[in-house]
Amino acid sequence: MQIKALSVSEVNQYMKRILGSDPILSHIYVKGEISNYRLHSSGHMYFTLKDKNSKISCVMFKGNCEKLKFFPEEGMSLVCKGYVSIYEKDGQVQLYVNDMEPSGIGALHLAFQQLKDRLNKEGLFDTKYKQEIPLIPRRIALITSPTGAAIRDMVSIILRRFPQVELCIFPVLVQGEGAVETIVKAIELCNRYPGIDLAIVGRGGGSIEELWAFNEEKVARAIFNSRVPIISAVGHETDFTISDFVADLRAATPSSAAELAVPNRVELREYIDSMEKRMIHLMKTKLNTSYQKLSFIENSYFFRYPLNPIYDKQQYINDLLQKIKSAINVKKQFNHRHLKYLGERLHSLSPLSIFSRGYSIVRNSEGSIVKSTDHVQVDERLCIDVIDGEINCKVIECKKEEKILGKY
């Protein structure tokens, strides 16, 4: 009997039918560590799931990827739900993943931590971006479910504490499909609505799945971008959501948010009365101090004799002028005496002053001063300068004598 040969395509198609009809492989959970993770531009996810002995190729299509609450990462331990089949084109056996969860920790808890870390790094939780909650808001927006207990509690508490405030209710879905979109739209509408001073975004308690809308990135960014200050009031005191971290103020419960949003009317009245009394006391103290200062000024020397300081300054200026004149006279007298002394010194050092003491100067015919008998000859004509003129004479005889130093 001749056995019919099958084509490669037929073999792969047969194997695919076998795998698809297997009750275990058609609906299976596989645990392993993710590696070779790659998110394709088409939106499909490709990776390998492995343990210490084996590995299997995995694919997760775009539609299923978009349902994930967390981002798979290289080396993460996962439990993948799906079915085993064969890729006919190359005959490769693959695990087609429909859903996955981190091993040992819930997907929602991991998604919460991943988003929290990412937004924190971006600075969305930074206190420098927190807006101040108004002390007495005139109009408050309540963004919550219109039918839950939270809205009844908030309205009751706010109107009891401060009935003058105006409440604007923006009804939204707080859980399930469409909740994120309605919350984001309500926050955006609240920012366009005129006169809104404050908004409370929240709901009552519930499981993490029921509170999850307030952990979504779109809601967090809408709260961060709001120009209206927002109080986050989600769940009970032990519940924390991403909205709590990004809001301008976190309240443990919706009831607490209502108390934080408005002051107590009675307490506010008491506070205003006490401030009024304190202000009156301060004003009286200030007036008394001012009266005392005014009285002191009225009795002061300057106030009673306002021109005396001017007279004192005038006398001071006159004294200075006298001192200046006296100093100038003293300087003039000193300079006069000094000048006279210098003149006398100059006169005593003048060559002409020797004539007054009986001396004369002898010059030869060339006008040179004769200092020695060696400088003249017999019959040479000389000119003798005296105090009142000159004498012309003729040398008859030259006698040389040795003079003793200091004789004359």
UniProtKB/Swiss-Prot annotation:
The keyword Hydrolase applies. It comes from the Bacteria. It catalyses: Exonucleolytic cleavage in either 5'- to 3'- or 3'- to 5'-direction to yield nucleoside 5'-phosphates. One of its GO terms (molecular function) is exodeoxyribonuclease VII activity. It is found in: Cytoplasm. GO terms for biological process: DNA catabolic process. It is an enzyme of class 3 (hydrolase). Keywords: Cytoplasm, Exonuclease, Hydrolase, Nuclease. One of its GO terms (cellular component) is cytoplasm. Its main location: cytoplasm. Its EC number is 3.1.11.6. CDD domains: ExoVII_LU_OBF (cd04489). Belongs to the XseA family. HAMAP family: Exonuc_7_L (MF_00378). Heterooligomer composed of large and small subunits. Bidirectionally degrades single-stranded DNA into large acid-insoluble oligonucleotides, which are then degraded further into small acid-soluble oligonucleotides. This is Exodeoxyribonuclease 7 large subunit. It comes from Alkaliphilus oremlandii (strain OhILAs).
